[in-house]
Amino acid sequence: MNSMSTTGPIRVAAIPKHYLQFTVRTYTRSMASAGLRYSNPPLVKKCYDQPTGKRFISSTPQSQIKDYFPPPDAPKIVEVKTAWAHPVYSEEEMRAVTVGHREAKNWSDWVALGSVRLLRWGMDLVTGYKHPAPGQEDIKKFQMTEKEWLRRFVFLESVAGVPGMVGGMLRHLRSLRRMKRDNGWIETLLEEAYNERMHLLTFLKMAEPGWFMRLMVLGAQGVFFNGFFLSYLISPRTCHRFVGYLEEEAVLTYTRAIKDLESGRLPHWEKLEAPEIAVKYWKMPEGNRTMKDLLLYVRADEAKHREVNHTLGNLKQAVDVNPFAVEWKDPSKPHPGKGIKHLKTTGWEREEVV
């Protein structure tokens, strides 16, 4: 017999409507932000260190923020050196980076642009991002907190490191299979993937992804890797144009984050220092190691990837030399290079570099 039938009448106290609304709203917000946990206490100290007369006790074990890349357990080794030293950017060069867009000129460009727009829609949905129209930045539904920005950065960079690795891998195998040189493409593509991974590792020093974010990254990376792999086999030119358009969106994202920081919408980042891994990788000078400086460096990298991939998309994939890995006869003229001194928003045309 059901045990409920043996008990007396149960009287349920009415729950006030305003309390129910508060409970539902709080639960919804907590689930939406469950994908990320801060690993830097100052970011959340002011938000949650409210004085109360209660002592909250929980039997749930507290998660410990682990270091995603601790130093190697090797007493004889001081540091692991990288094969790709990052070029030094000046503050003037980084501030000169602008949002830009290359117009689609053929069916290949339109396929790439449409794919990026679809990917952008999915990324916005997962990260809760809504891009405001000009003049609507102060509307509440468009405002982003520090935690929400970090969630978007982590998701974006975990996916952005895929194209360079896939392209470099396929070109490496093609070079071995055909027993011919690759003309400098492999190194540039692998270096791009490494750079995007350094972006991710830097942001992971500031926040630890939760189970929801890990699941989303796993699914997105699995689908994106295989899709890009097959697409690169079919049309490398379209894939490079796709990455160029994707980096346009990345520049737009970081530009808005910088504007939010400069306008005072992200108060916890105003005096936040960049992680040590970022200081060493970008060779950040003394006095220019804040969160704002970090975002300027990352945006400059994304702008460089935008230029590189739009340029590679303009070349003949099987025969042309990678213009970012060569020594020019006349260095006094503007040419493609590893730095951002002569950065071109829409890439270099083939006639300019071949």
Curated annotation (Swiss-Prot):
Query: What does the record give under GO molecular function?
Result: alternative oxidase activity; metal ion binding
Transmembrane segments annotated in the record for this chain: 153-173, 215-235
What cofactors does the UniProt entry give for this protein?
A: Fe cation
Which keywords belong to this entry? Electron transport, Iron, Membrane, Metal-binding, Mitochondrion, Mitochondrion inner membrane, Oxidoreductase, Respiratory chain, Transit peptide, Transmembrane, Transmembrane helix, Transport
* Residue numbers spanned by region Disordered: 333-354
What Gene Ontology cellular-component terms does the record carry? mitochondrial inner membrane; mitochondrion
Q: Show the InterPro entries listed in the entry.
A: AOX (IPR002680), AOX_sf (IPR038659)
- Compositional bias per record (Basic residues), positions renumbered to this chain: 335-344
Q: How is the cofactor bound?
A: Binds 2 iron ions per subunit.
Q: Where does Fe cation 2 bind?
A: 196, 247, 302, 305
User: EC number(s) for this protein?
Assistant: 1.-.-.-
The transit peptide spans 1-64
What is the recorded membrane topology of this protein?
Answer: Multi-pass membrane protein
The record's family statement is: Belongs to the alternative oxidase family.
Q: Known PANTHER family for this protein?
A: ALTERNATIVE OXIDASE
What's this protein's name?
Answer: Alternative oxidase, mitochondrial
Lineage in the entry? Eukaryota, Fungi, Dikarya, Ascomycota, Pezizomycotina
